[in-house]
Amino acid sequence: MNRKGKVGLVSGYFNPIHKGHLKYIFSAKARCDVLIVIINNDIQVKVKGSKPFQDEKQRFDIVNQLKSVDYTFLSTDKDNSVANSLRHIHNKLLKNYNYDILFFNSGDRGSQTWNEKEKKVCEELSVECIYLDLPKEASSSNLIDKLIDSEKGKCDRCDKPKWILSV
């Protein structure tokens, strides 16, 4: 049976989005016809222990505007995986179509440390897991820490962003 095309799925917190995230999204899009980006929700940001920078709506809206992104989906999961979201997207959108479905990952989840829940769901749904071995470009946590340090005047090497005004 001939497949109609490839649908790619990626997920991320994008809290905040940076150059490394963009390369991850662009690299995934280059390997598929349609790209769906799953945005981890605010509950997941707390579960991860990250510092909230932008809420899920802001992150969703920003990612949704990227040219490489065909569809965005706000995660329905309550843990550190997107397993339920993958299942939902597959069952509601992709199950009845003849697509190869690819789930891409990169960054802090190495090819040997793939989330087990996600891996299991992908196996059940015949979704191919592909690790994109991309160089580490930036870290959202480091960007947030750098901003906090620059605000406190603790960072010599940090230039204050132009939009932060001192009175």
Label every PLM stretch briefly:
Residues 1-167:
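Nucleotidyltransferase catalytic core that binds NTPs
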